[in-house]
A protein has these predicted regions:
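PAS-family sensory/regulatory modules and their coupling/dimerization elements
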Residues: 196-245
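PAS-family sensory domains
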Residues: 153-215
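Regulatory hinge/linker segments at domain boundaries
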Residues: 146-150, 242-260
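Short alpha-helical interdomain "coupling" segment at the junction between an upstream regulatory sensor module
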Residues: 135-151, 286
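Regulatory input/activation interfaces that engage signals or partners
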Residues: 1-129, 133, 137, 211-213
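Short, basic, alpha-helical segments at the C-terminal edge of helix-turn-helix-like DNA-binding modules
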Residues: 305-315
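The N-cap/first-turn positions of alpha helices
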Residues: 261-265
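Recognition helix of helix-turn-helix DNA-binding domains
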Residues: 259, 272-307
């Protein structure tokens, strides 16, 4: 099997998105070596990093915020390669992992000595569709994991300056950060989600980053939080709170590859409309609405309308 086939055949049952990426990187490294990597998941709507998976020994922990800021503030691939060259990186392979439903992440492999050969690049060329699908399906699987026991997510705020230095963290935000990216060593968690939305805000202010500075971050089980950055004079406030019904439904629809019409039907069903009311609202036949609902059940692997709505809402 070639590398893409090996990745497609990977048993993902029971794997978290982080464990999945670790397994995928292991298969890739067995065929194509690299000195460092960044394998990030992003919000499919905004493209902002939500879950980094990185081994970058050439970046000191204290320099991480500056590197993240420069990733968003560089307007071209050439400029980003200049940033990497300053870190001692001599060659890269970059993959944007996106489909018609959004941008799910990216993978960068870095080398600090010999460059990637044409043969190695050929081995990697077929990976983006496979990796894209795997990340999208990893998001979809989160909606089927029950919360046990259910825990309420407290809203919280992190204050940072323009250099991405944390100035204060509320207790609710601190607990949310622990769930987003638990530290592997004693000490506070790295506020990666905050760094990324703040970097996006700063780049947006400079006219470089096109989208709004917010993203949905997985907290474990079926829980999703929304993280937003907002300017407050010489500080930037990052708010963390439960994703709204609309935000969850959008992510649910993207992850399950729903069509625009199926997404409309889901939205109306989530707001309590029955089949007849949905048909009237969309000015379509009752039988057509039933067909859309059946397609929703099939695409989301739901056994009933109740289960479909519970998964989309997080119940």
């Amino acid at each position: 099997m070639d590398l893409a086939e090996r990745l497609s055949a990977l048993d993902v049952d029971g794997l978290t998105d982080r464990a999945l990426r670790t397994a995928q990187l292991g298969l890739i490294a067995a065929r194509v070596g690299f000195d460092a990597h960044v394998f990030a998941m992003t919000d499919p709507a905004t493209g902002i990093v939500t879950s980094p998976h990185a081994t970058v020994p050439m970046v000191a922990p204290g320099d991480l915020p500056a590197v993240i800021r420069r990733r968003y503030s560089t307007a071209s691939v050439t400029q980003w390669r200049t940033v990497l060259a300053e870190l001692g990186v001599t060659d890269t392979v970059s993959m944007t992992l996106q489909d018609r439903w959004g941008r799910w992440g990216f993978l960068e492999l870095w080398r600090c000595s010999a460059g990637f050969t044409d043969r190695e690049r050929d081995r990697l060329a077929g990976l983006p569709p496979v990796l894209t699908a795997s990340l999208r399906m990893a998001v979809a699987r989160t909606f089927t994991v029950p919360d046990a026991p259910p825990t309420r997510l407290e809203s919280g705020v992190i204050l940072l300056d323009d250099d991405l230095q944390v100035r204060s963290v509320t207790s609710g935000a601190g607990r949310a950060l622990m769930r987003m990216l638990p530290p592997t060593e004693p000490g506070p968690p790295v506020p990666a989600a905050a760094y990324n939305v703040v970097a996006a805000l700063l780049a947006h202010e400079d006219g470089i980053w096109p989208g709004e500075p917010w993203a949905r971050v997985h907290l474990g089980a079926s829980r999703w939080a929304s993280v937003r950055a907002e300017r407050l004079e010489d500080r930037i406030a990052v708010s963390i709170g439960p994703s709204t019904t609309t935000e969850r439904a959008d992510l649910f629809a993207r992850a399950h590859q729903l069509s625009p019409r199926q997404s409309e039907v889901l939205h109306l069903a989530l707001h309590g409309m029955d089949t007849r009311a949905i048909a009237d609202e969309l000015v379509i036949a009752h039988s057509t609405t039933e067909d859309h609902l059946k397609a929703l059940l099939a695409k989301t692997d739901s056994t009933s309308r109740h289960q479909l709505l519970a998964r989309a809402l997080g119940g």
